[in-house]
Amino acid sequence: MNHSIIASRCLVFVLMLLATGAVMAGDPMKGRPLYEIRCAGCHGPEGVPQVAGISNFKMGEGLMKPDQQLLSFVKKGKGVMPGFKGILTDAEIMDIIAHIRTFF
């Protein structure tokens, strides 16, 4: 095989990974302190909400969506939940999502 074919196949592989969001996986250890600061006030330190009408992560509420959909939701906010676009980076939000997934 010549080098241009190998390089082309490698490029296609990397682009496929980027397109699927595989590179965006969050780190739950990095997400924990961010969750404690930004989310625990309403969702509780272990994912059990302190306020009525808020997702209970311990019960899996709100977690059955793909990471990209949750990322969009956290950035925009809805109802009493504020949006975090411009406050948290996409990587930080993905870290928080990874941490939240450890509750269920």
Regions found by a protein language model. Name each.
Residues 74, 86-104:
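C-terminal capping alpha-helices of c-type cytochrome domains
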Residues 19-21, 26:
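N-terminal signal peptide c-region/cleavage motif recognized by signal peptidases
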